[in-house]
Curated annotation (Swiss-Prot):
Protein name: Alpha-2-macroglobulin-like protein 1
GO molecular function: peptidase inhibitor activity; serine-type endopeptidase inhibitor activity
One Pfam short name: MG3
Principal location: secreted
Glycan attachment residues as annotated in the record: N120, N281, N409, N857, N1020
Effect of R1001W: May be a risk factor for otitis media
SUPFAM superfamilies (alphabetical): Alpha-macroglobulin receptor domain, E set domains, Terpenoid cyclases/Protein prenyltransferases
Length: 1454
């Protein structure tokens, strides 16, 4: 290399530049607060008598960073400083100023830097990613700064939210222990299923976990091959492997589907048929290694066309031999048309003119393997023409090259590595096969010298904490320095935008000669990882500059190095093992060890180095935009404005070779750009920057580089098993084994003896540690295998229904080297029944590495968790086994296993809610609640609980997305998820309770609701229940949507055109009388029938216009009021009277309002301290303590309340009256904060929010005592700080009498919820309902089967038809609808939509009429369950859910 360099230098003509003293000041462009940063001053000898000052000027003060006088030799001086806080709190643009005074010199220079408050990172770690109801949740919270040092600041609040966003627990003023918060929470046995959230720092940081009903998998299925595919291949091997969690291979049946899916867009046109997927199905058995392999011909698939997806979907299902338990694995593999690829390696994006440019080209085949002895055509594109070189790769697929640059004339040059010189022929009808060539664009490095500096690259990722030698080559031109002059090479090591390390190498050119090398020893730490940069430069006495820059790849490491291990790494269940922990002295270590089975269910939730680094998304390229430095060109042109820092990509670019147009700033080819690229500001009078070239630039080519991946290392322990005592009983099966905090002493080591749980599995353990001096550290995950060579295992479902039979499977495993004879016993119990207790004992012969399965048909007779005890032992028998007497080991001859199953009650769940609003006002306010049960209750199925909130809107606030427990698949039902959020937000905003967390969550729901509602919009601007599927838009729903969109504009973006289009459509349907015509199906029941139909509809539309902010003078409003005045005082319909009273209150027509309110008062029902209205009053003798209101009664009472509250000011008498109405409405709440249907929920929540804003007195401090006559007592404390916390406790005595006693100041909202199961009722007053089940094949009761259901239903009530109706079909255990059911049902009469949830099929009907409607579909059995209990079919009126009919259906084979 040096010979070529010297040949290049002989061509240069010497020219000695005038010796000018120079300086160079560097510091980070982004100064994070709080942090310690460095500023460096590099001075030449010419400044020996000059005093330099560097200052940082902010809005608040001027801070002197450095004051220094030059020396007689070149010297680099750096000093650390504390970054001041930014003015304004978040960020501030400050000025860095350097000045020099002395020796007849006076100058100064300044630049901008950004001071930015750095955010901390917080993570939440749970002991497991998912839980079952009733389990304990453990979680930790850690906050650290960007240097991974733990922060010990107090958390003002940590809250836990359930899937409905109920705040079910909170912890206030939480103080970490050495940066770690360790908390726990007990889930209720009836805990809601779904995703729970741990919210920290006012909701800015979240951790989540799931609550599900699951059974831990015992084995893992993996698609081992293929990992990648290419169109070049003729075939590929599919390999599926399955192993138990303790590492042994599993035997079972394998089904593999290898499919190429058809592209949906390809057959979207109506005239095209849907293309079938191209599939190959494979089946077989796993071998002794637990694997199954089979070849697949690539000719099966479409490799060149566009009609099919260019990826293969592999779905593998493995069924365990003997148990029938199955597990799945899915893999999508891209079929690459790429036949090979080339990449440049060990190259820069610039070259030094007249010095040889060297690099390498890596060549890979279609499978990413290195291609050896392969031709490479290197093409050089320059201003002087195009030149070619032919290279050959070595055994590593590398082709090195060296190019002479003297002929490039200091211009841009592009290099391309090609597989072949001829271009491939492109066929637009086919996916082209191609070679990925290598591209590299080179710019000349700007320098006024003929000297050279080059840094050798290091292959990464590099290890932290280990010294790395970096070799630097240089050549010094004689013109740049005389032989007796000392040359100083300055270097900076930059990580995460901070100057971490700096130094100088002083060399004497006389001693070193023209060319030489030196090395730097660098040690990388977490402050530098993962992508540090090194900049080296020299400024010669002549003024010339040489420089080079390199970026390293460093592992994501931490300064606190943590390791964890078990000794031995394999141990018997129930035996002791030593846990060995190592970390920095004084660390506090948080340990976690969980069953690998849990991680198989959720493998992506683990804490890792990458996830911790990901909390600090460090910014590397260029300067922050606030302090960017652009080159300004004097001429106007396409770049005559400040340019962005990111390269804009023109549309229609090719993904293989993309053209990037650059703005006019220097591009990485001078010392200035080196510093800019690593985020350092530089102030200097040296020639460090290339002059600006404002001429038009040619497009350049950009190439992306890929990164390789590693393979996990296999580890096997040869440590012998320690023997535990014989006849072990295994019944301790935690999913989390270890969850503890361990302090580390001065030795940096800790050893703890722990007992291995009873599960045969692998335990995955990890630990993180915190230290104030060494920061955060995270250990690799290690495993401990709990294993014994002879054991029994039980296969159980998560839950069963009492009375249903299920199959209990026991599998005995023999991993001894000999055959054994075993006896297996299932213990008797009164909690379950066996078909024949004589079959509870079995014996069999079991040879090495074999397994034997035994089955029993079990019927559970007791609710709750019941235990199954299975015992197996090795018999000392003379009966031959494997051709000889069975082997009997000295120890480990028996194994006993105890495992539970949850038994659930049969029947239909009924939920009753009693709500109470207690306002003690200085004296005790009390109420009695009687938990009474019906006679037809399912035995032992009762549960009851009480919930307490300090705010009347609290339950609704916590359940914004679940106010009504009904399907929500049409345009109006979607609005019940939308409208109440607006009212809740309005209330919270006025009450000063609207936190950023609540706003963020609520706005998210609004944005989703807005998007969904637009699906139901017609092209004319109107809306209907099912959108364009309906013939016309609907007047009522359009008014409802328009009102809500108008009110939501304050919180989210609503396109004004959507509102204007709807208003225009409604205006077109306003009659000359001012009334509104009923267009489309009128969904709302209360507006149907008789003369009041037009009046109530007009009232609703006019109210909607007024509520969205329209003035009474608006033509649509004024004409609507004119229509309503004609019948305002003459209407006798109670609902219409309440609605009109509200309308005229909004319009300010107080005379008419008062007349209507008097009419309402005459029909008000007063019950104790409550006031309400009902269209069908119920005699008081039949009054129920439970919430069972008619939806229309809730709605008209809510309108009456809105009318009472809508006036400029309220008297105390009016507030008292409103409170009495609220007392009744509050009692009608369901357990989720809503009411029975949609419109009653919307209007009632609107009224309650208005009351809460106007007249409600929230709790200051209240003690609520809940007690029973059976000596149960629980006290709840409610204050302003926990006003919105959802407090709950179980009520143990059912049936029973409970008393609620509230004392203190304010109001408290209490709900008592009673849940029990009953056998389905057969009431047919409003709907007829029957079902026929087609003939089923019952010959093979152990095989899955299909059932055809034919449902007959009609409306038999007092009206001509029902409102929208839902047919709700519950699935039999183990059954689900066959594929295509949705499309089949949508073709049947009146069906508007079909939805399938976990175990329920909902069929939406436009209405039901007197004529019987018939619906037929098929359900198929996917899980075999015997002795099936019946399932239910229910039909109900969506808007009058009390109108319903329910029947049962059964499997005819049972």
């Amino acid at each position: 290399m040096w010979a070529q360099l010297l040949l290049g230098m002989l061509a240069l003509s010497p020219a000695i530049a005038e010796e000018l003293p120079n300086y160079l000041v560097t510091l980070p462009a982004r100064l994070n607060f709080p942090s310690v940063q460095k500023v460096c001053l590099d001075l030449s000898p010419g400044y020996s008598d000059v005093k330099f000052t560097v200052t940082l000027e902010t809005k608040d003060k001027t801070q002197k960073l450095l004051e220094y006088s030059g020396l007689k030799k070149r010297h680099l001086h750096c000093i650390s400083f504390l970054v001041p806080p930014p003015a304004g709190g978040t960020e501030e643009v400050a000025t860095i100023r350097v000045s020099g005074v002395g020796n007849n010199i006076s100058f100064e220079e300044k630049k901008k830097v950004l001071i930015q408050r750095q955010g901390n990172g917080t993570f939440v770690q749970t002991d497991k990613p998912l839980y079952t109801p009733g389990q304990q949740v453990y979680f930790r919270i850690v906050t650290m700064d960007s240097n991974f040092v733990p922060v010990n600041d107090k958390y003002s609040m940590v809250e836990l939210q359930d899937p409905n966003s109920n705040r079910i627990a909170q912890w206030l003023e939480v103080v970490p222990e050495q940066g770690i918060v360790d908390l726990s929470f007990q889930l209720a046995p009836e805990a809601m299923l779904g995703t729970y959230t741990v919210a920290v720092a006012e909701g800015k940081t979240f951790g989540t976990f799931s609550v599900e009903e699951y059974v831990l998998p015992k084995f893992k299925v993996e698609v081992v091959e293929p990992k990648e595919l290419s169109t070049v291949q003729e075939s590929f091997l599919v390999k599926i492997c399955c192993r138990y969690t303790y590492g042994k291979p599993m035997l079972g049946a394998v089904q593999v589907s290898v499919c190429q899916k058809a592209n949906t867009y390809w057959y979207r046109e109506v005239e095209r048929e849907q293309l079938p997927d191209k599939c190959r199905n494979l089946s077989g058995q796993t071998d002794k290694t637990g694997c199954f392999s089979a070849p697949v011909d690539m000719a099966t698939f479409d490799l060149i066309g566009y009609a099919y997806s260019h990826q293969i979907n592999i779905v593998a299902t493995v069924v365990e031999e003997g148990t029938g338990v199955e597990a799945n694995a899915t893999q999508n593999i891209y079929i690459s048309p790429q036949m090979g690829s080339m990449t440049f390696e060990d190259t820069s994006n610039f070259y030094h003119p007249n010095f040889p440019f060297s690099g390498k080209i890596r060549v890979r085949g279609h499978d990413d393997s290195f291609l050896k002895n392969h031709l490479v055509f290197l093409v050089i594109y320059g201003t002087n023409g195009t030149f070619n070189q032919t290279l050959v790769t070595d055994n590593n697929g590398l082709a090195p090259f060296t190019l002479e640059t003297s002929g490039w004339n200091g211009t841009d040059v592009s290099l391309e590595g090609k597989f072949q010189m001829e271009d491939l022929v492109y066929n637009p009808e086919q996916v082209p096969r191609y070679y990925q060539n290598a591209y590299l664009h080179l710019r000349p490095f700007y320098s006024t010298t003929r000297s050279f500096l080059g840094i050798h690259r290091l292959n990464g990722p590099l290890k932290c904490g280990q010294p790395q030698e970096v070799l630097v080559d240089y050549y010094i031109d004689p013109a740049d320095a005389s032989p007796d002059q000392e040359i100083s090479f300055s270097y900076y090591l930059i990580g995460k935008g901070s100057l971490v390390m700096e130094g100088q190498k002083h060399l004497n050119s006389k001693k070193k000669g023209l060319k030489a090398s030196f090395s730097l020893s660098l040690t990388f730490t977490s402050r530098l990882a993962p992508d540090p940069s090194l900049v080296i430069y020299a400024i010669f006495p002549s003024g010339g500059v040489v420089a080079d820059k390199i970026q390293f790849s460093v592992e994501m490491c931490f300064d606190n190095q943590v390791s964890l291990g078990f000794s031995p790494s394999q141990q018997l269940p129930g035996a002791e093992v030593e846990l060995q922990l190592q970390a920095a002295p004084g660390s506090l270590c948080a340990l976690r060890a969980v069953d690998e089975s849990v991680l198989l269910l959720r493998p992506d939730r683990e804490l890792s180095n990458r996830s911790v680094y990901g909390m600090f998304p460090f910014w590397y390229g260029h300067y922050p935009y606030q302090v960017a430095e652009y080159d300004q060109c004097p001429v106007s042109g396409p770049w005559d404005f400040p340019q962005p820092l990111i390269d804009p990509m023109p549309q229609g670019h090719s993904s293989q070779r993309s053209i990037i147009w650059r703005p006019s700033f220097s591009e990485g080819t001078d010392l200035f750009s080196f510093f800019r690229d690593v985020g350092l500001k530089i102030l200097s009078n040296a020639k460090i920057k290339k002059p600006v070239d404002c001429s038009h630039r040619s497009p350049e080519y950009s190439t992306a580089m890929g990164a390789g991946g590693g393979h996990p290392e296999a580890f096997e322990s040869s440590t012998p098993l320690h023997q535990a005592e014989d006849s072990q009983v295994r019944q301790y099966f935690p999913e989390t084994w270890l969850w503890d905090l361990f302090p580390i002493g001065n030795s940096g080591k800790e050893a703890v003896h722990v007992t291995v749980p009873d599960a045969i599995t692998e335990w995955k353990a990890m630990s993180f540690c915190t230290s104030q001096s060494r920061g955060f550290g995270l250990s690799p995950t290690v495993g401990l295998t709990a294993f014994k060579p002879f054991f029994v295992d039980l296969t159980l479902p998560y839950s069963v229904v009492r009375g249903e039979s299920f199959r209990l499977t026991a599998t005995i495993f023999n991993y001894l080297k000999d055959c054994i004879r075993v006896q297996t016993d299932l213990a008797k119990s009164h909690e379950y029944q066996l078909e024949s207790w004589a079959d509870s004992q079995t014996s069999s012969c079991l040879c090495a590495d074999d397994a034997k399965t035994h089955h029993w048909n079990i019927t559970a007779v007791k609710l709750g968790h019941i235990n199954f005890t299975i015992s197996t032992k090795i018999l000392d028998s003379n009966e031959p086994c494997g051709g000889q007497k069975g082997f009997v080991p000295q120890k480990g001859r028996s194994d006993t296993l105890i495992k539970p199953v949850l038994v659930k009650p049969e029947g239909v769940l009924v939920e009753k809610t009693h709500s109470s609003l207690l306002c003690p006002k200085g004296k005790v306010a009390s109420e009695s609640v009687s938990l009474e049960l019906p006679v037809d209750i399912v035995p032992d199925s009762t549960k009851a609980y009480v919930t307490v909130l300090g705010d009347i809107m609290g339950t609704a606030l916590q359940n914004l997305d679940g106010l009504v427990q009904m399907p929500s698949g049409c345009g109006e039902q979607n609005m019940v998820l939308f409208a109440p959020i607006i009212y809740v937000l309005q209330y919270l905003e006025k009450a000063g309770l609207l936190t950023e967390e609540i706003r963020s969550r609520a706005v998210g729901f609004l944005e989703i609701g807005y998007q969904k509602e637009l699906m139901y919009k017609h092209s004319n601007g109107s809306y209907s229940a099912f959108g364009e599927r309906d013939g016309n838009g609907n007047t009522w729903l359009t008014a409802f949507v328009t009102k809500c969109f108008g009110q939501a504009q304050k919180f989210i973006f609503i396109d004004p055109k959507n509102i204007q289009d709807a208003l225009k459509w409604m205006a077109g349907n306003q009659l000359p009388s001012g009334c509104y015509a009923n267009v489309g199906n009128l969904l709302h029941t209360a507006m149907k029938g008789g003369v009041d139909d037009e009046v109530s509809l007009t009232a609703y539309v006019t109210a909607a216009l007024l509520e969205m902010g329209k003035d009474v003078d608006d033509p649509m409003v004024s004409q609507g009021l004119r229509c309503l005045k004609n019948s305002a005082t003459s209407t006798t319909n109670l609902y219409t009277q309440a609605l009109l009273a509200y309308i005229f209150s909004l319009a300010g027509e107080m005379d008419i309002r008062n007349i209507l309110l008097k009419q309402l008062d005459q029909q008000a029902i007063i019950s104790g301290e409550s006031i309400y209205w009902s269209q069908k009053p119920t005699p008081s003798s039949n009054a129920s303590p439970w919430s069972e209101p008619a939806a229309v009664d809730v709605e008209l009472t809510a309108y009456a309340l809105l009318a009472q509250l809508t006036k400029p000011s309220l008297t105390q008498k009016e507030i008292a009256k409103a409170t009495s109405i609220v007392a009744w409405l509050a009692k009608q709440h369901n357990a989720y904060g809503g009411f029975s249907s949609t419109q009653d929920t919307v209007v009632a929540l609107q009224a309650l929010a208005k009351y809460a804003t106007t007249a409600y007195m929230p709790s200051e401090e209240i003690n609520l005592v809940v007690k029973s006559t059976e000596n149960f007592q629980r006290t709840f404390n409610i204050q302003s700080v926990n006003r919105l916390v959802f407090q709950q406790d179980t009520l143990p005595n059912v049936p029973g009498m409970y008393t609620l006693e509230a004392s203190g100041q304010g109001c408290v909202y209490v709900q008592t919820v009673l849940r029990y199961n009953i056998l389905p009722p057969t009431n047919m007053k409003t709907f007829s309902l029957s079902v026929e089940i087609g003939k089923a094949r019952c010959e093979q009761p152990t095989s899955p089967r299909s059932l055809t259901l034919t449902i007959h239903t009609s409306y038999v009530g007092s009206r001509s038809s029902s409102n929208m109706a839902i047919v709700e079909v519950k699935m039999l255990s183990g059954f689900s609808p066959m594929e295509g059911t949705n499309q089949l049902l949508l073709q049947q009469p009146l069906v508007k939509k079909v939805e399938f949830g976990t175990d329920t099929l909902n069929i939406y009907l436009d209405e039901l009429i007197k004529n019987t409607q018939t619906y037929t579909f098929t359900i198929s059995q996917s899980v075999l369950v015997t002795n099936l209990k019946p399932a239910t079919i229910k039909v109900y009126d969506y808007y009058l859910p009390d109108e319903q009919a329910t029947i049962q259906y059964s499997d005819p084979c049972e």
